[in-house]
A protein has these predicted regions:
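Intrinsically disordered, metal-sensing/regulatory segments
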Residues: 1-259
């Protein structure tokens, strides 16, 4: 149980630590640094989706022979459609263009910005939850080291995400303390959805490959819909692509070394 709690808490701690940067760094993050951090986060999420979620989903379905890809295929598309639905029913703000999405709302710009990050933290919590659910179920394709690698990888990419939300809020006039707590709040959904996913998975263990790829599809939706546009916004620069490669390589190394 302690391993499970630690696994769910690690990504949230990453967000909180990143949000705490607002106490030490007084200036808003430069555009180049934001691009770099966003690219890094995208790389980690893509690698985690492949090595920690899609590959185990296919490996768990080998009994289906040539159709072993089907559960992963189905779950992937369900994850994409789930995030697409949330994108359309929850009002939120895209940081890179300042444009709102979802139904019309009287929410403040700050509230919609926090909602945007919160929305995109949901699949990360689900990813950690479903991997730890697989570990609890005794799945041979998921090891304690692999689950820890995913939790650490998401925590690493959550650190810059926490800073990217708290520091601009402070620069816009929010108090340092409020900016910190808003950043922390955006990450609170991760352990919540992680725990909910574990409970759901415990009820439908045979559907584990679908759940794994569902989380992967949801995470990749966030990467393509939000992170890639952010790391490519403004004047042309390769910094986002280079840090994407760094994030991908780091997550791949973590998964292999700890898995």
């Amino acid at each position: 149980m302690s391993t499970l709690i630690m696994g769910l808490a690690i990504p949230f701690i990453g967000t909180a630590a990143g949000s705490a940067c607002v106490f030490f760094l007084r200036k808003e993050l430069s555009v180049s640094l934001q691009r770099a951090l966003t690219g890094f986060a995208a790389g980690v999420m893509v690698a985690a989706s492949i090595w920690s979620l899609i590959v185990p989903a296919i490996e768990q379905s080998q009994v289906l022979g040539r159709w072993a890809f089907l559960p992963a295929f189905l779950g992937f598309w369900l994850g994409i459609l789930f995030l697409l639905l949330l994108d359309h029913i929850i009002p939120h703000l895209h940081r890179n263009i300042g444009q709102t999405e979802g139904p019309k709302s009287r929410l403040t710009r700050t509230a919609m910005l926090v909602l945007a990050v919160t929305l995109h933290n949901i699949p990360e919590g689900m990813a950690v939850g479903v991997v730890y659910a697989g570990l609890r179920s005794g799945s041979g394709e998921i090891t304690a080291g692999g689950a820890l690698a995913l939790a650490l990888g998401i925590a690493i990419q959550n650190f810059p995400e926490g800073a990217i939300i708290s520091m601009p809020l402070c620069a816009e006039g929010k108090s340092t303390v409020n900016s910190f707590w808003l950043g922390v709040l955006s990450g609170a959904v991760e352990p919540i959805f992680g725990a909910l996913t574990i409970l759901a998975a415990a009820l439908i263990v045979p559907a584990m490959p679908v759940l794994l790829s569902f989380a992967a599809g949801a995470m990749l939706y966030v990467v393509v819909e939000e992170l890639i546009p952010e790391m490519s916004a403004g004047e042309h620069s390769n910094i986002g692509v280079l840090l994407f490669a760094v994030g991908f390589s780091l997550m791949m190394a973590l998964d292999v070394a700890l898995g």
